[in-house]
Amino acid sequence: MCFASSIIEAHRKLFIAPPDLDHSDPATPTISTRSKMPRGKSRLQTEVCGDCGAGDPSWASINRGILLCADCCSVHRSLGRHISIVKSLRQGNWEPSVLNFVNSLNAHGANSVWEHHLLDGSTNSTGGKHVPRWRKPTPKDALHPTKSDFIKAKHVNLTFVLKPSLQDDDDGNGSAGCLEQELSRQLHASVRTSNLETSLRFLVQGADPNYYHEDKLSTPLHMAAKFGQASQIEMLLIYGADVNALDGNGMTPLELARANNHNTIAERLLDAMYDVTDRIITFLGGKKPDHASGRHMIIPDANGADISEQLKIARGKLQLVPNKMFEELVMDLYDEVDRRECEAIWSTSTLNADHATVPFLPANPFLSATRNQGRQKLARFNRAEFTGLLTDVLVDAMRRQNMANLRPMDAPVAGHQSLQSLPYANNSMLLGSFEQGGHDPNLSDDEPIYDPVASDDDYAPVPPMAQQAIVHTPPRSANSHNEMETLRKQLNDYKSEINQLKNVVQMLSSENTQLKSKFSSASNNSVYDEPLRIDLSLSSPDTEHEPLSLPEGGTANGESGSSNDSSNQSTIKRPASMYERRLVPNVAKGNTDIRNTTSMYQMAGDGKPFGEEVKVRSDLVTRRLKELIRAMQPVPEDQKQSIAPHGELIRSAVTDLIALYANLPPNASDPSRETLKLLTRQNILIQHECENLQKAIEADDKQAIQKNTLEVRDCAFHIASAIKTLVLQFY
């Protein structure tokens, strides 16, 4: 903890002396004017509030570089961290380099940058003739509205800041981009010196803290690290400089500081990389990790804590958040941590009723309304819930950082980025304030964006946790390189394998499509679809050869038998096996008018009667079916036969049988045509099912064996039934 009296006294001799004229900015006459002030007056200005002149300031605005009294600080806090980053001089936890920077900037005239037009008397230069002249308030003036209006004009609207003019551009083309580039080049040169006021003026006017100088091949942060300017580094970090930026030699500012033996600056840059997690760990009651020894994270240990199902779901959702959204969440949590710390100090240090508290984060006009709502809802978490959320974020940040270390070729993930630049990322460019004129009129701090949330139970209270230090040891470069090469090689192999499999799938798909089209065309253009008329007789003197019941329009003698036929068809029962007799009433025995005429198409091609040839080929199919059934019977392992060849033999025999009907005349009967269609379809299916059964037997898949066996039996039954129908036409 640091105390204002000892702080100011310790730095008085260092920062009160008149600045060196060689480092003064010729464009800012206030510097030379202040350097000629008596020592007593200069000392007096450094010990007073920068906004109202009150003595014994107890707060400081880090990014403004001024000290503040409690009255003015209350207004600064209500503006938000995107305007002013305030911290208590007496009770705040300060980094020595940051405290040194604030006192140095305050002592060397930071207020002359924010009150430029107020000091030179041109307070009406930014408005019309009806704009009233501004007067700097005194300590005795009322906080509202005198002090608050002045502070908002000074720090929000930047009314008194010397704004850059496009006519001042050297190339005379009036380009805003060229003006910003010129300001950035001057900032790049200024950070090599100790003149903080000049650098602050360039930043306020719109210079880019991450500007990459094409000739010097470096950024301003590289230059400040190279020349050992610790205060300049703090200013650049506060205004958003990237601590991981690379120069033309591929070096970061940290590596450049070490190369120039600026070890203290190197340690500070290393701490800045982990400022977010350090701040959260400290807020949780932990000790700041020793980054120099490789310890970057201290996460509370939740051993023995009851984890609810809701908390598990919330943690799972947190891990699915994209890196960019995770960065924004960490930024908002960082701001909320700062608000709660300041609020705790504020509640114990002020007794004035006019000093309003800040119950939630003020609205930031540079953020969306949805995000502002989410930021303000963070204040609804109680201490236990907020602690649980911070702990989960720390764990997930470490997980994302480890993933980034395992995949260095990828872009930096949220954990990597948030540990480096998030504490300063929400300091918007002040040049945007010149163009927009301050806050969005639709957003007001008097009417905060605050609505009910869906649920407050995502993070249930977490019991007290012990602390466990996690040490990260940097991996060896050689091993990491070898591992990365191995992973790249494996990745390429997997990609080639996937491409090969895709080609195989595409080839099989095309072949399948071709086969389907061929089968469809063969079925549609088959000679069996031609109309033919076959005189069928359903009578059989032999009960062993009972015919199948086929639909017919009437009997041969012209008697109507539709009612009997329909009743007989409804009582047909499917046999349990292909050899079991059908239980069909013998309805055809009463028919005595049997046609015995043999037509010309009933002669086979070799001169044999057609019916005799059909019977011969049908017997062959029957033998093949019996062989298949025997092969499917359970036998010892050494006597098992392959099922697939039997399917091929059956297909060949059935094909020969169907070939006899190739020359049928177009007057064949419908039952014959349907029977041949059924026989053709089942002939194709039985070979396929036999192959599937063989594969199931080889894989010893009992469920598949049972299923495929039923399919094979079903196909064999239909083939036998169709053959029986064809044979009975001739008996």
From Swiss-Prot:
Residues 443-459 have a biased composition (Acidic residues). A zinc finger (C4-type) spans 49-72. Its main location: cytoplasm. CDD domains: ArfGap_GIT. One of its GO terms (molecular function) is small GTPase binding. ANK repeats lie at residues 216-245, 249-278. Disruption phenotype: Homozygous knockout flies show a semi-lethal phenotype and exhibit defective wing morphology at 100% penetrance. Mutant embryos show striking guidance phenotypes in ventral oblique muscle 5 (VO5) and ventral oblique muscle 6 (VO6), characterized by bypass and mistargeting of the mutant muscles toward the ventral midline. Defects in targeting of the growing ventral tips of mutant muscles toward the ventral midline are already detectable at late stage 14/early stage 15 embryos. Residues 477-518 form a coiled coil. InterPro entries: Ankyrin_rpt, Ankyrin_rpt-contain_sf, ARFGAP/RecO, ArfGAP_dom, ArfGAP_dom_sf, GIT-like, GIT1_C, GIT_SHD. It is found in: Cytoplasm; Synapse; Cell junction, Focal adhesion; Cell projection, Lamellipodium. Residues 557-570 have a biased composition (Low complexity). Residues 32-168 form the Arf-GAP domain. The keyword Ion transport does not apply. PROSITE patterns: ANK_REP_REGION (PS50297), ANK_REPEAT (PS50088), ARFGAP (PS50115). Expressed in embryonic muscle syncytia (at protein level). Keywords: ANK repeat, Cell junction, Cell projection, Coiled coil, Cytoplasm, Cytoskeleton, GTPase activation, Metal-binding, Repeat, Synapse, Zinc, Zinc-finger. One of its GO terms (cellular component) is synapse. GO terms for biological process: brain development; mushroom body development; negative regulation of organ growth; positive regulation of hippo signaling; protein localization to presynapse; regulation of ARF protein signal transduction; regulation of G protein-coupled receptor signaling pathway; somatic muscle development. Residues 124-145, 435-461, 537-582 are annotated as: Disordered. GTPase-activating protein for ADP ribosylation factor family members, including ARF1. Multidomain scaffold protein that interacts with numerous proteins and therefore participates in many cellular functions, including receptor internalization, focal adhesion remodeling, and signaling by both G protein-coupled receptors and tyrosine kinase receptors. Through Pak activation, may positively regulate microtubule nucleation during interphase. May play a role in the regulation of cytokinesis. May form homodimers (via coiled coil). Forms a complex with pix and Pak; the interaction with Pak may be indirect and mediated by pix/dPIX. The coiled coil region may mediate dimerization. This is ARF GTPase-activating protein Git. It comes from Drosophila melanogaster. The gene is Git.
